């Protein structure tokens, strides 16, 4: 039988140390490790969205995608310095921005600027960030 700490542990990549580390933080819910992991995935999303943005010919959609992608990352970073409801609100703003970014990517696909294959990585990362933000805002009850 797995111990309680083992059942709730997971690995998190720590870029400053350049290694995967085992985290004993709860898999879901707020913890420094989970918030850091969310920020790392958001950084990956911002990197992956750039080639998609560059293909979008409509300036309004491109600019909105740029703004909301950056908003996701910056609001997660700002949540790190907050406590209580203010932290939850920042996660909520980041989640809303991630959902906007997702719709902007789907619009770019619908309008023929990028294919689903070209946008697959960005959509996958956005989906992951949204799921993490929901769990950071609304941790599961034991």
Regions found by a protein language model. Name each.
Residues 1-142:
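Amphipathic alpha-helical assembly/interaction segments
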């Amino acid at each position: 039988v797995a111990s309680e700490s083992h059942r709730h542990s997971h690995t998190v990549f720590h870029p400053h140390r350049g290694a995967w580390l085992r985290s004993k933080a709860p898999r879901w819910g707020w913890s420094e490790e989970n918030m850091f992991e969310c920020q790392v995935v958001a950084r990956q999303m911002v990197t992956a969205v750039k080639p998609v943005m560059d293909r979008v010919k409509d300036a309004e959609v491109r600019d909105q995608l740029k703004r909301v992608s950056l908003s996701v990352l910056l609001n997660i970073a700002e949540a790190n310095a907050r406590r209580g409801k203010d932290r939850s609100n920042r996660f909520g703003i980041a989640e809303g921005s991630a959902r906007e970014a997702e719709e902007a990517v789907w619009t770019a696909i619908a309008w023929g600027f990028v294919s689903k294959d070209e946008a697959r990585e960005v959509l996958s990362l956005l989906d992951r960030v949204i799921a993490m933000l929901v769990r950071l805002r609304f941790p599961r009850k034991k």
